[in-house]
A protein has these predicted regions:
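Glyoxalase I/VOC metalloenzyme domain signal
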Residues: 1-27, 31-57, 67-170
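A binding-site-centric feature that preferentially detects glycan-recognition modules on secreted/surface proteins
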Residues: 62-65
Length: 170
């Protein structure tokens, strides 16, 4: 994880955008399984390391949230207490070499992020769903991403559990 954090920061530093990522809290780290079998193995592997794990069907796949007992070391981004474990979309395979698909940085206002990225001509895309809005920046040739999000995965998960949309595993 520290190597990924450094690569993410170097990407933004190379565009003169270090101020975008300095001191931003990492909301969570997301890993994508190669297939359903590996996804299930990840759940079994991480379950003993959590205070709570839940999952939610998202279309034809499942996405789990693991609340870790001991935070992950995210290098210069600090500690991360949430891990998102994603089953790949049908027909898709994970392309990342070290299992990390993306990290999400929590920001109260996405407008300064989009303005700074536009000003430096950094390619990004917007991701909007019922849970949150995110600015997504691909940082390397493996398709790994940094996402700036306006809502915490913990808050999203709490809402989904309360509504019965997500189920607790532990």
């Amino acid at each position: 994880m520290p190597a990924y954090a450094e690569e993410a920061k170097l990407f933004f530093y190379s565009y003169g955008l270090a101020d975008l990522v300095i001191d931003l809290p990492v909301d969570h780290v997301a890993i994508k399984a190669l297939d359903r079998k590996v996804y299930d193995q990840y759940l079994k592997t991480f379950l003993p390391l959590t205070t709570r794990m839940s999952f939610k069907p998202v279309g034809p796949r499942d996405i789990a949230t693991a609340e870790l007992s001991t935070p992950l070391d995210a290098g210069t981004f600090g500690a991360v207490e949430l891990l998102e474990i994603m089953e790949p979309k049908p027909g898709a395979i994970a392309t990342t070499h070290d299992l990390i698909d993306h990290i999400e940085l929590l920001v109260p206002d996405l407008e300064p992020i989009t303005k700074a990225l536009k000003d430096k001509e950094v390619i990004y895309k917007m991701q909007v769903n019922e849970n949150h809005t995110a600015v997504v920046v691909e940082i390397n040739e493996w398709g790994q991403e940094v996402k700036f999000t306006d809502r915490s995965l913990f808050d999203i998960t709490e809402k989904q559990i309360a509504k019965g949309a997500a189920k607790i595993i532990s």
